[in-house]
């Protein structure tokens, strides 16, 4: 997905965000049907790639559409409502998947997406507004460079974390650096670059992007490490682990809409900064749990993490989108999705590295890394107060 986020976001600025979003829904729904009916592993793999392309089309313009659906004075409310939906999905998704697998075969995990996708397409066709378009041309070379750069970032990071041969890692890193430098150089003279360098010249946007990247790295570290931590270090069962993971997204779903509404009146830098302080504290409290904690000991710590992330997410999205001009909403939305995916990929790779160092103590080390990322995100968030003056 991460390889195509920025190209699809740029395409959205040219043809309209509504078209890209609906096309993403159609591709994702069709690919889900192919997954459910797949007759071989190669067929399933190809269908999963198509699913990723569809999801990329949805994610890259989702935040941009929110900007055009809600008036500026209610943008924080819109971001909060979006975060509510994401939080509920995170909380309910694993339970629904487990329920499906308890009564049906794995293809039904994909088949259930088909009626939901058709329903979503119908709503999108009816409700999504048309958006302004730019007259710029789609830059195919930049799209290829962006796909190679971000795709290689995820690949190289994963290979390095899993102890791949050094030659493979170094070769991937070399190509990544060359393509990345070429991409940046190609974007510099452009008025509406695919990699939104023009937006990074705005201090609030740059700091908001850094805050998002670090926060999602912290989230990625936590969400991948915690199941290992609960099962390997604390000796909890798989069922217990699933239940113990639930408080985080539930609290996010509860608090994110509140934080979004508050961000329409209170500086997002303040809300986001304190939210990341809460996440830092929650991750450290989890990392230093007693040897035999009760369920309540774990739940209230997970709730602190969810509360911190919930108070960060919506205000940061509002700050990031409002710091970009309306005609560059696609580029800003693309950076939102790219920061999320690259941050989560970075976190997952660091967990693999920590587990490679120690299966027993690796999860705790990963949580400490997550707290460090959240701390950096908090500092970057508060720095926006000075940058915005």
Locations of regions flagged by a protein language model:
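Structural signature of transmembrane alpha-helices in multi-pass secondary transporters
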Residues: 1, 28, 51-52, 59, ...
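Conserved kink/hinge residues within transmembrane alpha-helices of Major Facilitator Superfamily
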Residues: 2-9, 94, 256-260, 348
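12-transmembrane solute porter fold
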Residues: 62, 85, 165-172, 191-389
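Small-residue (Gly/Pro/Ala) motifs that create kinks and tight helix-helix packing interfaces
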Residues: 92-101, 157, 227, 347-355
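Helix-loop-helix hairpins in multi-pass membrane proteins, especially solute transporters
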Residues: 10-141
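Small-residue-rich packing faces within the transmembrane alpha-helices of Major Facilitator Superfamily
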Residues: 2, 29-30, 53, 114-121, ...
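Hydrophobic transmembrane-helix bundles of small-molecule transporters
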Residues: 102-211, 218, 236, 244, ...
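Hydrophobic alpha-helix/TM-entry signal in multi-pass membrane transporters
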Residues: 21, 28, 44, 138, ...
């Amino acid at each position: 997905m991460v390889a195509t986020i920025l190209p699809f976001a740029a395409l959205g600025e040219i043809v309209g965000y509504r078209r890209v979003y609906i096309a993403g829904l159609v591709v994702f729904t069709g690919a889900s049907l192919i997954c459910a009916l797949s007759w071989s592993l190669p067929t399933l793999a190809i269908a999963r790639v198509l699913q990723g392309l569809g999801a990329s089309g949805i994610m890259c313009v989702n935040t941009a559409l929110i900007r055009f659906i809600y008036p500026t004075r209610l943008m924080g409310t819109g971001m909060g409502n979006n975060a509510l939906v994401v939080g509920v999905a995170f909380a309910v998704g694993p339970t629904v998947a487990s329920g499906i697998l308890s009564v049906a075969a794995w293809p039904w995990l994909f088949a259930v997406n088909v009626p939901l996708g058709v329903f979503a397409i119908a709503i999108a066709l009816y409700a999504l507004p048309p958006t302004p378009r730019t007259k710029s041309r789609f830059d195919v070379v930049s799209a290829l460079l962006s796909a190679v750069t971000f795709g290689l970032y995820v690949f190289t990071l994963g290979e390095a974390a899993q102890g791949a041969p050094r030659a493979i890692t170094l070769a991937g890193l070399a190509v990544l650096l060359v393509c990345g430098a070429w991409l940046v150089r190609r974007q510099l003279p452009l008025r509406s670059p695919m990699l939104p360098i023009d937006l990074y010249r705005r201090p609030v946007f740059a700091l908001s992007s850094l805050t998002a990247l670090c926060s999602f790295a912290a989230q990625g570290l936590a969400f991948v490490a915690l199941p290992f931590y609960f099962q390997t270090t604390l000796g909890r069962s798989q069922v217990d682990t699933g239940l113990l993971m639930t408080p985080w997204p539930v609290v996010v779903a509860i608090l994110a809409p509140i934080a979004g509404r508050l961000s329409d009146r209170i500086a997002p830098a303040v809300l986001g900064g304190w939210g990341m302080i809460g996440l830092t504290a929650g991750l450290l409290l989890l990392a230093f749990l007693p040897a035999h904690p009760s369920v309540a000991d774990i739940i209230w710590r997970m709730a602190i993490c969810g509360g911190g992330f919930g108070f960060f997410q919506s205000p940061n999205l509002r700050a990031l989108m409002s710091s970009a001009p309306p005609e560059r909403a696609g580029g800003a939305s693309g950076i939102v999705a790219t920061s999320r995916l690259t941050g989560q990929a970075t976190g997952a790779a660091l967990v693999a590295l920590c587990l490679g160092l120690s299966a027993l103590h690796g999860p705790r080390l990963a949580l400490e890394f997550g707290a460090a990322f959240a701390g950096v995100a908090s500092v970057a968030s508060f720095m926006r107060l000075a940058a915005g003056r």
